[in-house]
């Protein structure tokens, strides 16, 4: 059975897309910790990020870097943090989170509640910065 992320890539489930190439896809986290919180995934359905081939893992990091630089332009911050957890969705993914402090990376923090219009605006700002 396809993961929710594979279904997003296939267009079966809507998302707020930020960027895409032939191997990778970036979209906003629907339960963001801060504005600009983005997920980067391989289009190939792989549960554990370290099960990706060396080439695909390296390429995913290069893609994530492009997205992170755009996030930093769209949402000025001290740094864009990166986290790989992968326990909730069995599909490898990288969280990219604009940070003003390390506290912005605490996944136990309350999540933002944003409207569809806010999500659309955020995704557009990041895409435009790419």
Please place each PLM-identified region on the residue numbering.
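HIT superfamily nucleotide-processing domains
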Residues: 1-130
